[in-house]
Amino acid sequence: FFIISFFPCEKKSYLRGNEVFMKHYDIIIIGAGPGGIFSAYELATKRPNLKIAVFEAGNRLEKRKCPIDGKRVTKCIHCKTCAIMNGFGGAGAFSDGKYNITNEFGGTLYEYIGKNKATELMEYVDEINMAYGGEGTRLYSSANSSFKRVCLQHNLHLLEASVRHLGTDKNYEVLSNLYNLLKDKVSFYFMTPVQNVAIMDNGDYEIITENETYTCEKCIISVGRSRSKWMEQICHNLEIPTNSSRVDIGVRVELPAEVFAPITDELYESKIVYQTEKYQDRVRTFCMNPKGAVVTENTNGIITVNGHSYENPALHTKNTNFALLVSKHFTEPFKDSNEYGESIARLSNMLGGGVMVQRFGDLIRGQRSNPKRIAESFLTPTLDATPGDLSLVMPKRILDGIIEMIYALDNIAPG
Protein backbone atom coordinates (compact mmCIF):
# COMPACT_ATOMS: atom_id res chain seq x y z
CA PHE A 1 0.00 0.00 0.00
CA PHE A 2 1.22 3.50 -0.79
CA ILE A 3 0.81 6.28 1.76
CA ILE A 4 3.01 9.33 1.22
CA SER A 5 3.21 12.42 3.40
CA PHE A 6 4.25 15.73 1.90
CA PHE A 7 4.30 17.55 5.24
CA PRO A 8 7.38 17.54 7.46
CA CYS A 9 6.86 16.36 11.00
CA GLU A 10 8.84 16.85 14.17
CA LYS A 11 11.46 14.26 14.99
CA LYS A 12 10.69 12.20 18.06
CA SER A 13 12.84 10.58 20.72
CA TYR A 14 12.19 7.21 22.30
CA LEU A 15 13.45 5.86 25.62
CA ARG A 16 14.94 2.40 26.06
CA GLY A 17 16.14 1.90 29.64
CA ASN A 18 18.19 5.02 30.35
CA GLU A 19 19.13 5.45 26.67
CA VAL A 20 17.41 8.00 24.47
CA PHE A 21 17.70 7.13 20.78
CA MET A 22 16.38 8.44 17.46
CA LYS A 23 14.72 5.91 15.21
CA HIS A 24 11.90 7.95 13.77
CA TYR A 25 11.58 8.89 10.10
CA ASP A 26 9.07 10.99 8.25
CA ILE A 27 8.75 8.27 5.61
CA ILE A 28 10.02 4.71 5.48
CA ILE A 29 10.16 2.87 2.16
CA ILE A 30 10.25 -0.92 2.23
CA GLY A 31 11.91 -2.34 -0.87
CA ALA A 32 14.65 -0.84 -3.07
CA GLY A 33 13.30 -2.00 -6.41
CA PRO A 34 12.03 0.46 -9.04
CA GLY A 35 9.01 1.48 -6.92
CA GLY A 36 11.16 2.19 -3.88
CA ILE A 37 13.95 3.88 -5.82
CA PHE A 38 11.71 6.30 -7.69
CA SER A 39 9.68 7.03 -4.55
CA ALA A 40 12.92 7.94 -2.77
CA TYR A 41 14.05 9.98 -5.79
CA GLU A 42 10.87 12.06 -5.89
CA LEU A 43 10.77 12.65 -2.15
CA ALA A 44 14.48 13.38 -1.75
CA THR A 45 14.73 15.77 -4.69
CA LYS A 46 11.44 17.62 -4.19
CA ARG A 47 11.20 17.59 -0.39
CA PRO A 48 14.81 17.42 0.85
CA ASN A 49 13.71 18.41 4.37
CA LEU A 50 12.05 15.03 4.88
CA LYS A 51 13.86 12.33 6.83
CA ILE A 52 13.62 9.19 4.68
CA ALA A 53 14.80 5.60 5.11
CA VAL A 54 14.78 2.67 2.69
CA PHE A 55 14.84 -0.92 3.98
CA GLU A 56 15.99 -3.64 1.58
CA ALA A 57 16.25 -7.40 2.14
CA GLY A 58 19.16 -7.69 -0.31
CA ASN A 59 22.50 -6.01 -0.76
CA ARG A 60 23.69 -2.77 -2.31
CA LEU A 61 24.12 -2.90 -6.08
CA GLU A 62 27.87 -3.47 -6.29
CA LYS A 63 27.68 -6.30 -3.71
CA ARG A 64 24.97 -8.26 -5.52
CA LYS A 65 26.98 -11.27 -6.71
CA CYS A 66 25.41 -14.57 -7.74
CA PRO A 67 27.81 -17.46 -6.91
CA ILE A 68 27.02 -19.24 -10.19
CA ASP A 69 30.17 -18.81 -12.29
CA GLY A 70 29.63 -21.59 -14.82
CA LYS A 71 32.72 -23.44 -13.59
CA ARG A 72 32.90 -24.24 -9.87
CA VAL A 73 29.22 -23.41 -9.32
CA THR A 74 26.91 -24.26 -12.22
CA LYS A 75 23.51 -24.37 -10.53
CA CYS A 76 21.61 -22.46 -7.86
CA ILE A 77 22.82 -23.23 -4.32
CA HIS A 78 19.79 -21.60 -2.66
CA CYS A 79 21.42 -18.60 -0.99
CA LYS A 80 19.42 -17.23 1.94
CA THR A 81 18.99 -13.98 0.00
CA CYS A 82 19.08 -14.33 -3.79
CA ALA A 83 21.46 -11.75 -5.28
CA ILE A 84 19.55 -11.81 -8.56
CA MET A 85 16.11 -11.20 -7.04
CA ASN A 86 16.95 -8.97 -4.05
CA GLY A 87 19.01 -5.85 -3.53
CA PHE A 88 19.18 -2.29 -4.81
CA GLY A 89 17.49 -2.21 -8.20
CA GLY A 90 15.15 -5.10 -7.44
CA ALA A 91 14.67 -8.23 -9.52
CA GLY A 92 15.23 -6.24 -12.72
CA ALA A 93 18.67 -4.89 -11.84
CA PHE A 94 20.42 -7.48 -14.01
CA SER A 95 17.66 -7.87 -16.57
CA ASP A 96 17.97 -6.41 -20.05
CA GLY A 97 16.68 -3.01 -18.94
CA LYS A 98 13.48 -2.66 -20.97
CA TYR A 99 11.12 0.17 -20.05
CA ASN A 100 7.73 -0.06 -21.74
CA ILE A 101 5.79 3.15 -22.33
CA THR A 102 2.25 1.95 -22.91
CA ASN A 103 -1.11 1.36 -21.24
CA GLU A 104 -1.80 -1.81 -23.23
CA PHE A 105 0.21 -4.09 -20.93
CA GLY A 106 2.44 -4.01 -17.88
CA GLY A 107 -0.06 -2.82 -15.29
CA THR A 108 -3.34 -1.04 -14.66
CA LEU A 109 -2.18 2.33 -13.29
CA TYR A 110 -4.37 4.07 -15.88
CA GLU A 111 -7.47 2.72 -14.14
CA TYR A 112 -6.69 5.01 -11.20
CA ILE A 113 -5.25 8.15 -12.83
CA GLY A 114 -6.28 7.95 -16.49
CA LYS A 115 -4.30 6.93 -19.57
CA ASN A 116 -2.87 10.36 -20.37
CA LYS A 117 -1.47 10.87 -16.86
CA ALA A 118 -0.13 7.32 -16.74
CA THR A 119 1.70 7.86 -20.04
CA GLU A 120 3.11 11.17 -18.77
CA LEU A 121 4.56 9.42 -15.72
CA MET A 122 6.12 6.67 -17.82
CA GLU A 123 7.73 9.28 -20.07
CA TYR A 124 8.95 11.09 -16.95
CA VAL A 125 10.67 7.91 -15.74
CA ASP A 126 12.26 7.59 -19.17
CA GLU A 127 13.61 11.15 -18.87
CA ILE A 128 15.18 10.31 -15.51
CA ASN A 129 16.79 7.18 -16.93
CA MET A 130 18.22 9.21 -19.81
CA ALA A 131 19.59 11.83 -17.42
CA TYR A 132 21.38 9.24 -15.26
CA GLY A 133 23.24 7.19 -17.84
CA GLY A 134 20.76 5.96 -20.43
CA GLU A 135 21.41 8.62 -23.05
CA GLY A 136 22.11 7.29 -26.53
CA THR A 137 19.98 4.16 -26.14
CA ARG A 138 17.29 3.46 -28.70
CA LEU A 139 13.55 3.97 -28.25
CA TYR A 140 11.66 1.37 -30.31
CA SER A 141 8.01 1.69 -31.31
CA SER A 142 5.40 -0.67 -32.73
CA ALA A 143 2.96 2.15 -33.53
CA ASN A 144 3.39 2.08 -37.33
CA SER A 145 4.93 -1.34 -37.75
CA SER A 146 4.03 -3.39 -40.83
CA PHE A 147 4.09 -6.46 -38.57
CA LYS A 148 0.69 -5.45 -37.18
CA ARG A 149 -0.96 -6.45 -40.44
CA VAL A 150 1.14 -9.61 -40.76
CA CYS A 151 0.16 -10.65 -37.23
CA LEU A 152 -3.55 -10.02 -37.82
CA GLN A 153 -3.47 -12.30 -40.85
CA HIS A 154 -2.62 -15.15 -38.49
CA ASN A 155 -4.93 -14.28 -35.58
CA LEU A 156 -2.07 -12.63 -33.67
CA HIS A 157 -2.26 -9.14 -32.20
CA LEU A 158 0.80 -6.92 -31.88
CA LEU A 159 0.24 -4.55 -28.96
CA GLU A 160 1.22 -0.91 -29.40
CA ALA A 161 4.08 0.36 -27.25
CA SER A 162 7.26 2.37 -27.14
CA VAL A 163 10.15 0.42 -25.62
CA ARG A 164 13.36 1.91 -24.29
CA HIS A 165 16.09 -0.74 -24.27
CA LEU A 166 18.92 0.12 -21.92
CA GLY A 167 20.55 -3.30 -21.92
CA THR A 168 21.81 -5.06 -18.81
CA ASP A 169 25.03 -3.03 -18.87
CA LYS A 170 23.40 0.41 -19.24
CA ASN A 171 20.65 -0.50 -16.80
CA TYR A 172 23.31 -1.19 -14.16
CA GLU A 173 24.93 2.18 -14.90
CA VAL A 174 21.64 4.05 -14.46
CA LEU A 175 20.91 2.30 -11.16
CA SER A 176 24.44 2.99 -9.91
CA ASN A 177 24.10 6.69 -10.72
CA LEU A 178 20.72 6.89 -8.98
CA TYR A 179 22.16 5.23 -5.88
CA ASN A 180 25.09 7.67 -5.81
CA LEU A 181 22.58 10.52 -5.94
CA LEU A 182 20.39 9.12 -3.16
CA LYS A 183 22.91 7.67 -0.71
CA ASP A 184 23.62 11.08 0.90
CA LYS A 185 19.95 12.09 0.96
CA VAL A 186 18.33 8.87 2.17
CA SER A 187 19.25 6.35 4.90
CA PHE A 188 19.63 2.90 3.32
CA TYR A 189 19.37 -0.27 5.42
CA PHE A 190 20.64 -3.15 3.29
CA MET A 191 20.39 -6.84 4.25
CA THR A 192 17.59 -5.74 6.57
CA PRO A 193 14.32 -7.47 5.69
CA VAL A 194 11.30 -6.03 7.44
CA GLN A 195 9.47 -8.65 9.48
CA ASN A 196 6.30 -6.75 10.32
CA VAL A 197 4.48 -3.44 9.93
CA ALA A 198 2.05 -2.31 12.62
CA ILE A 199 -0.03 0.79 13.32
CA MET A 200 0.68 2.49 16.65
CA ASP A 201 -1.88 4.17 18.89
CA ASN A 202 -0.85 7.64 17.64
CA GLY A 203 -1.34 6.62 14.01
CA ASP A 204 2.37 6.25 13.21
CA TYR A 205 3.75 3.06 11.69
CA GLU A 206 6.03 0.65 13.51
CA ILE A 207 8.55 -1.04 11.22
CA ILE A 208 9.98 -4.17 12.83
CA THR A 209 13.20 -5.84 11.67
CA GLU A 210 15.12 -8.73 13.22
CA ASN A 211 17.26 -6.52 15.46
CA GLU A 212 15.58 -3.11 15.67
CA THR A 213 12.25 -1.32 15.56
CA TYR A 214 11.73 1.95 13.69
CA THR A 215 8.78 4.32 13.43
CA CYS A 216 7.49 6.65 10.74
CA GLU A 217 4.52 8.84 9.95
CA LYS A 218 4.03 7.43 6.46
CA CYS A 219 5.09 4.15 4.88
CA ILE A 220 5.52 2.96 1.31
CA ILE A 221 5.67 -0.79 0.73
CA SER A 222 7.04 -1.88 -2.64
CA VAL A 223 8.52 -5.33 -2.17
CA GLY A 224 7.91 -7.02 -5.52
CA ARG A 225 7.25 -10.62 -6.39
CA SER A 226 9.83 -12.24 -4.10
CA ARG A 227 7.99 -11.03 -0.99
CA SER A 228 4.44 -11.23 -2.29
CA LYS A 229 3.46 -13.77 0.39
CA TRP A 230 4.80 -11.48 3.11
CA MET A 231 2.83 -8.62 1.59
CA GLU A 232 -0.35 -10.69 1.69
CA GLN A 233 0.18 -11.30 5.41
CA ILE A 234 0.81 -7.60 6.10
CA CYS A 235 -2.39 -6.67 4.27
CA HIS A 236 -4.26 -9.24 6.34
CA ASN A 237 -2.79 -7.90 9.60
CA LEU A 238 -3.63 -4.29 8.70
CA GLU A 239 -7.09 -5.27 7.41
CA ILE A 240 -6.34 -4.05 3.90
CA PRO A 241 -8.69 -5.84 1.47
CA THR A 242 -7.08 -7.88 -1.32
CA ASN A 243 -8.38 -10.00 -4.16
CA SER A 244 -7.04 -12.90 -6.17
CA SER A 245 -5.41 -11.54 -9.29
CA ARG A 246 -4.42 -13.43 -12.39
CA VAL A 247 -1.50 -15.80 -12.53
CA ASP A 248 0.75 -16.12 -15.57
CA ILE A 249 2.09 -19.61 -16.24
CA GLY A 250 4.38 -20.50 -19.08
CA VAL A 251 7.80 -21.33 -20.44
CA ARG A 252 10.82 -19.49 -21.77
CA VAL A 253 11.50 -20.26 -25.42
CA GLU A 254 15.02 -20.09 -26.85
CA LEU A 255 15.75 -20.20 -30.58
CA PRO A 256 18.36 -19.03 -33.10
CA ALA A 257 18.47 -15.24 -33.17
CA GLU A 258 18.07 -15.23 -36.96
CA VAL A 259 14.55 -16.64 -36.70
CA PHE A 260 13.13 -13.59 -34.93
CA ALA A 261 15.61 -11.05 -36.35
CA PRO A 262 13.10 -9.45 -38.78
CA ILE A 263 10.91 -8.59 -35.77
CA THR A 264 13.51 -7.81 -33.11
CA ASP A 265 15.62 -5.64 -35.43
CA GLU A 266 12.65 -3.32 -35.90
CA LEU A 267 10.72 -3.61 -32.64
CA TYR A 268 13.19 -5.22 -30.21
CA GLU A 269 10.41 -6.07 -27.75
CA SER A 270 7.21 -7.29 -29.40
CA LYS A 271 4.21 -8.04 -27.21
CA ILE A 272 2.13 -10.44 -29.29
CA VAL A 273 -1.20 -11.81 -28.01
CA TYR A 274 -3.01 -14.89 -29.29
CA GLN A 275 -6.40 -16.35 -28.36
CA THR A 276 -6.37 -20.12 -28.52
CA GLU A 277 -8.99 -21.84 -30.63
CA LYS A 278 -9.46 -24.75 -28.25
CA TYR A 279 -10.00 -22.98 -24.93
CA GLN A 280 -10.20 -19.29 -25.91
CA ASP A 281 -7.34 -18.58 -23.49
CA ARG A 282 -5.02 -15.62 -24.03
CA VAL A 283 -1.35 -16.45 -24.62
CA ARG A 284 1.26 -13.73 -25.01
CA THR A 285 4.93 -13.18 -25.57
CA PHE A 286 6.80 -11.51 -22.74
CA CYS A 287 10.32 -10.26 -22.01
CA MET A 288 11.98 -10.77 -25.39
CA ASN A 289 15.79 -10.85 -25.31
CA PRO A 290 17.38 -10.68 -28.76
CA LYS A 291 20.84 -12.28 -28.77
CA GLY A 292 20.49 -12.75 -25.03
CA ALA A 293 20.88 -15.47 -22.42
CA VAL A 294 18.59 -17.46 -20.14
CA VAL A 295 19.46 -17.18 -16.44
CA THR A 296 18.15 -18.67 -13.20
CA GLU A 297 16.36 -16.90 -10.35
CA ASN A 298 15.45 -17.99 -6.84
CA THR A 299 11.95 -16.91 -5.80
CA ASN A 300 10.90 -18.09 -2.34
CA GLY A 301 13.23 -21.07 -2.69
CA ILE A 302 11.89 -22.00 -6.14
CA ILE A 303 14.27 -21.92 -9.10
CA THR A 304 12.79 -20.20 -12.15
CA VAL A 305 14.27 -18.57 -15.24
CA ASN A 306 14.51 -15.11 -16.74
CA GLY A 307 16.18 -13.60 -19.78
CA HIS A 308 19.00 -11.06 -20.08
CA SER A 309 20.44 -9.19 -23.04
CA TYR A 310 23.11 -6.52 -23.40
CA GLU A 311 23.40 -3.28 -25.33
CA ASN A 312 27.09 -4.01 -25.93
CA PRO A 313 27.41 -6.17 -29.13
CA ALA A 314 30.48 -7.88 -27.68
CA LEU A 315 28.22 -9.55 -25.10
CA HIS A 316 25.61 -10.83 -27.58
CA THR A 317 24.87 -14.55 -27.99
CA LYS A 318 23.60 -16.46 -31.03
CA ASN A 319 20.18 -17.03 -29.44
CA THR A 320 17.02 -15.05 -28.78
CA ASN A 321 14.76 -15.97 -25.87
CA PHE A 322 11.30 -14.89 -24.75
CA ALA A 323 8.56 -16.10 -22.43
CA LEU A 324 5.22 -17.49 -23.54
CA LEU A 325 2.63 -16.98 -20.83
CA VAL A 326 -0.95 -18.15 -20.40
CA SER A 327 -2.99 -15.89 -18.12
CA LYS A 328 -5.53 -17.45 -15.78
CA HIS A 329 -8.04 -15.64 -13.60
CA PHE A 330 -9.58 -17.49 -10.67
CA THR A 331 -12.99 -17.04 -9.10
CA GLU A 332 -14.41 -17.87 -5.67
CA PRO A 333 -13.72 -19.83 -3.60
CA PHE A 334 -10.09 -20.02 -4.81
CA LYS A 335 -8.02 -17.03 -3.67
CA ASP A 336 -4.34 -18.02 -3.78
CA SER A 337 -3.25 -17.54 -7.39
CA ASN A 338 0.40 -17.08 -6.35
CA GLU A 339 0.46 -20.47 -4.65
CA TYR A 340 -1.04 -22.10 -7.74
CA GLY A 341 1.78 -20.79 -9.92
CA GLU A 342 4.46 -21.63 -7.38
CA SER A 343 3.19 -25.19 -6.99
CA ILE A 344 3.76 -25.79 -10.71
CA ALA A 345 7.27 -24.35 -10.47
CA ARG A 346 8.00 -26.52 -7.42
CA LEU A 347 6.91 -29.62 -9.33
CA SER A 348 9.31 -28.70 -12.14
CA ASN A 349 12.12 -28.30 -9.60
CA MET A 350 11.26 -31.66 -8.05
CA LEU A 351 11.31 -33.53 -11.36
CA GLY A 352 14.33 -31.76 -12.82
CA GLY A 353 16.36 -30.94 -9.73
CA GLY A 354 16.08 -27.31 -10.78
CA VAL A 355 15.30 -25.80 -14.18
CA MET A 356 14.04 -28.22 -16.84
CA VAL A 357 14.70 -27.95 -20.60
CA GLN A 358 13.01 -29.80 -23.48
CA ARG A 359 13.27 -29.63 -27.26
CA PHE A 360 10.01 -28.56 -28.90
CA GLY A 361 10.07 -31.56 -31.23
CA ASP A 362 10.39 -33.92 -28.28
CA LEU A 363 7.45 -32.21 -26.57
CA ILE A 364 5.24 -32.66 -29.63
CA ARG A 365 6.21 -36.33 -29.93
CA GLY A 366 5.58 -36.95 -26.23
CA GLN A 367 9.24 -37.82 -25.80
CA ARG A 368 11.43 -36.83 -22.87
CA SER A 369 14.55 -34.90 -23.89
CA ASN A 370 17.88 -36.29 -22.71
CA PRO A 371 21.45 -34.95 -22.83
CA LYS A 372 22.15 -36.76 -26.11
CA ARG A 373 19.13 -35.25 -27.85
CA ILE A 374 19.92 -31.78 -26.52
CA ALA A 375 23.49 -32.09 -27.83
CA GLU A 376 22.20 -33.12 -31.28
CA SER A 377 20.21 -29.89 -31.61
CA PHE A 378 21.47 -27.14 -33.92
CA LEU A 379 20.89 -24.72 -31.04
CA THR A 380 23.07 -24.69 -27.95
CA PRO A 381 21.09 -23.57 -24.85
CA THR A 382 22.63 -20.64 -22.99
CA LEU A 383 21.62 -22.16 -19.64
CA ASP A 384 22.78 -25.52 -18.31
CA ALA A 385 19.46 -27.14 -17.35
CA THR A 386 18.18 -30.67 -16.79
CA PRO A 387 16.58 -32.32 -19.86
CA GLY A 388 13.07 -33.52 -19.07
CA ASP A 389 9.41 -33.69 -20.07
CA LEU A 390 7.31 -30.56 -19.60
CA SER A 391 4.07 -32.50 -20.09
CA LEU A 392 4.65 -34.07 -16.66
CA VAL A 393 4.75 -30.60 -15.10
CA MET A 394 2.42 -28.22 -16.90
CA PRO A 395 -1.38 -28.50 -16.75
CA LYS A 396 -2.67 -29.79 -20.10
CA ARG A 397 -4.73 -26.70 -20.82
CA ILE A 398 -1.72 -24.43 -20.29
CA LEU A 399 0.60 -26.59 -22.37
CA ASP A 400 -1.93 -26.91 -25.20
CA GLY A 401 -2.17 -23.12 -25.34
CA ILE A 402 1.61 -22.70 -25.49
CA ILE A 403 1.96 -25.26 -28.29
CA GLU A 404 -0.84 -23.60 -30.27
CA MET A 405 0.85 -20.21 -29.83
CA ILE A 406 4.20 -21.54 -31.09
CA TYR A 407 2.57 -22.82 -34.27
CA ALA A 408 0.87 -19.43 -34.74
CA LEU A 409 4.20 -17.60 -34.29
CA ASP A 410 5.77 -19.91 -36.87
CA ASN A 411 3.56 -18.18 -39.46
CA ILE A 412 5.25 -14.81 -38.92
CA ALA A 413 8.73 -16.06 -37.96
CA PRO A 414 9.28 -19.44 -39.65
CA GLY A 415 11.74 -21.65 -37.83
Where would I find each of the regions flagged by the language model?
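Short terminal hydrophobic/aromatic SLiMs and anchors at protein ends
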Residues: F2-S5
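Ligand/cofactor-recognition surfaces for anionic moieties
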Residues: V20
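Residues forming the flavin
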Residues: K23-G106, A143-S145, R149-G415
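Dinucleotide-binding Rossmann-like beta1-alpha1 core, especially the glycine-rich loop
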Residues: G87-T137
